[in-house]
């Protein structure tokens, strides 16, 4: 058995070509695709989360897709444990794990280890969520800035998940999230060698892809998907209820927005999210091969790079 076993990591913005690349690489390398997108973990949101199709999932093994009910939350620590189990299973089966997704925190937690942050007690979490429902994300961000200006400065005022997380940790521990993130990390898993790719398409093409994909989602049944989600009567603060497109289409179903306005708003939210992802991957993932997956020459070079490197260490 070799001292290290290969794991491919593919990150980048939404609509940036990650899933197609992962499928191609898994086919070329006898691989198993492992999901690292926090929203594609949820069951019942195949269309709106751009999860691979049933036909695509049948081409090569896919793991950690649609495994969590929308009524639950998923932490980076829990995902990491599940991902490591799937990576080990893939290696034991003689396959190459291809971990793909736009949730950068998941990818970093896997490759570099996870900050040892104390768990947030449920009463503190519930209080924070109630405050968020009362104030909204920008106002909660302002409160965070008053107590943790450095941490708030690193967060977009509209990033609900990260603002709420920072507020919960501050309330639960009395220390900013940044303190725990720099206090030390759990060690990265031994015996693995990570090859990291970051998809970086040009922004104009990326934003056009975001807009076009949302229109395809509507044609593929996104509205019906959200109608089924709404029928579950879930807490609107749950992560699944804040997936891209869900709040806007819920507003349309309530009669608050015409479909055209809901579509435009969701497209703008998707472009904003893609922009934040581009920035995050550029500054937070250092050791990566970055490329434009829409450039055939670059894509072919990356495919060869992966095949050559996996061959060397498998």
UniProtKB/Swiss-Prot annotation:
Alphabetically ordered keywords of this record: ATP-binding, Magnesium, Nucleotide-binding, Transferase, tRNA processing
Recorded catalytic activity of this chain's protein: adenosine(37) in tRNA + dimethylallyl diphosphate = N(6)-dimethylallyladenosine(37) in tRNA + diphosphate
Required co-factors: Mg(2+)
Enzyme class: transferase
Site (Interaction with substrate tRNA): 103, 125
MF terms (GO), sorted A to Z: ATP binding; tRNA dimethylallyltransferase activity
UniProt-annotated stretches for the region Interaction with substrate tRNA: 37-40
InterPro entries: Dimethylallyltransferase (IPR039657), IPT (IPR018022), P-loop_NTPase (IPR027417)
Taxonomy, superkingdom: Bacteria
Entry EC number(s): 2.5.1.75
Amino-acid positions noted as binding substrate in the UniProt annotation, renumbered to this chain: 14-19
Residues reported in the UniProt entry to bind ATP: 12-19
Pfam family membership, one: IPPT
GO biological process terms on file: tRNA modification
Subunit relationships: Monomer.
Sequence similarity: Belongs to the IPP transferase family.
Function: Catalyzes the transfer of a dimethylallyl group onto the adenine at position 37 in tRNAs that read codons beginning with uridine, leading to the formation of N6-(dimethylallyl)adenosine (i(6)A).
HAMAP family, A to Z: IPP_trans
Official protein name in the record: tRNA dimethylallyltransferase
Source organism of this protein record: Rhodospirillum centenum (strain ATCC 51521 / SW)
Phylogenetic placement of the source organism: Bacteria, Pseudomonadati, Pseudomonadota, Alphaproteobacteria, Rhodospirillales
